[in-house]
Amino acid sequence: MEKLTLSPISRIDGEINLPGSKSLSNRALLLAALAKGTTQVTNLLDSDDIRYMLNALKALGVNYQLSDDKTVCVVEGIGGAFQWQNGLSLFLGNAGTAMRPLAAALCLKGDTESEVILTGEPRMKERPIKHLVDALRQTGANIQYLENDGYPPLAIRNQGIFGGKVQIDGSISSQFLTALLMAAPLGEGDMEIEILGELVSKPYIDITLAMMKDFGINVEHYNYQRFLIKGKQYYISPQTYLVEGDASSASYFLAAAAIKGKVKVTGIGRNSIQGDRLFADVLAQMGAKVTWGEDFIQVEKSELKGIDMDMNHIPDAAMTIAITALFAQGETVIRNIYNWRVKETDRLTAIATELRKLGAEVEEGEDFIRIQPLALDKFKHAEIATYNDHRIAMCFSLIALSDTSVTILDPACTAKTFPTYFSEFEKISKNQ
């Protein structure tokens, strides 16, 4: 297996231009494909998950031109539901941001009835999709499980989504609601969605609603508990759509600065539609100096204090706090993060396991993690297993800010969202 050893870093200094957000990139591509008109999507992320979406759209008859550097995509919208040859199979890797929204969009009524199979890597077949399928079936969608109930692969027939009252469980993933919201306006009737349980990762729903509005569709909602969507609408191309920098990816650089230096990250700022921009506020609560601009966030180190906080609203960026906690004074508790367990891997167990290898004292609860700090000279060198999870690889790069080197196994797994992460991290790492 490929390994990457990072030597101890004495300080962090520099500026990072963020690649496009994964969540926004795949939403933008799907909305552009479904819309009337041609859309130029700029600052698109070039990564595995985006390639799976692009390949699926091509197989579904969508024409697009991708620039040589793969960051600009001109998409010719089809102005409604997808059409495809019966018997199509789409392989979506481990890309939840492709699997969930496509599963809903492919239920929309086509001119001729066809079946499509959605499948992916073994881990994708372990990632739950039952809450979305249950909701789609309430609207009249025709979806079957091909292997295990509640999990991909799925067989979908484009017989239509007929609106009405739909209940959806919001407690596992906001992507299920995102998928339903994005498909609903193209359905045959008006839809009222009621959320059961606590809706996790609300800021990701804000992203979805903001993007739908950019493509001409307004959704009414009542405190995130009920959503009203008119049927028989069309998305209208905004002609150009700029994908914001990935706020989750910003978290590693901002945390590195909070621990040992100063970094300016461009591509997101105070007006970002991504909830993970709030990660910078968490660093500020821990004691870091944070400066906000229109399109940048700057963080400078200061003495960090541990925190005890519900981080349900920023689950991806919260992982970075688990590492930052080692460098703070006092314990840190990250709460209400059960959905870490249904991501690319079971992130709660994975992070607890790898932190212990470093010598950290960690308590793993069902939906929380409690972490005690470590003195810089008390870190043990460890080989960090990454579980084919891009965010674990990026998080644990921060261990090099201690007095000990760290070895990351399978560093190439960052290709899911940030193929050049380690070279960017190296640029801001100073050793004198």
Curated annotation (Swiss-Prot):
Q: Which family does it belong to?
A: Belongs to the EPSP synthase family.
In the UniProt entry, which residues are flagged as the active site? Answer: D316
The alphabetized list of GO BP terms reads: amino acid biosynthetic process; aromatic amino acid family biosynthetic process; chorismate biosynthetic process
NCBIfam families per record: aroA (TIGR01356)
Q: Which UniProt keywords apply?
A: Amino-acid biosynthesis, Aromatic amino acid biosynthesis, Cytoplasm, Transferase
For this entry, the protein name equals: 3-phosphoshikimate 1-carboxyvinyltransferase
Binding of 3-phosphoshikimate, residues:
K22, S23, R27, S173, S174, Q175, S201, D316, N339, K343
Q: Reaction(s) catalyzed by this protein?
A: 3-phosphoshikimate + phosphoenolpyruvate = 5-O-(1-carboxyvinyl)-3-phosphoshikimate + phosphate
- Gene name linked to the record: aroA
Q: What's this protein's function?
A: Catalyzes the transfer of the enolpyruvyl moiety of phosphoenolpyruvate (PEP) to the 5-hydroxyl of shikimate-3-phosphate (S3P) to produce enolpyruvyl shikimate-3-phosphate and inorganic phosphate.
Hey, which pathway is this one from?
Metabolic intermediate biosynthesis; chorismate biosynthesis; chorismate from D-erythrose 4-phosphate and phosphoenolpyruvate: step 6/7
Entry's EC annotation: 2.5.1.19
Q: Where does the UniProt entry say this protein principally localizes?
A: cytoplasm
What is the superkingdom listed in this entry's lineage? Bacteria
Q: One GO MF term, please?
A: 3-phosphoshikimate 1-carboxyvinyltransferase activity
- What compartments host this protein? Cytoplasm
Binding-site positions, phosphoenolpyruvate: K22, G96, R127, Q175, R347, R391, K416
How does this protein assemble?
A: Monomer.
What GO cellular component entries does it have? cytoplasm
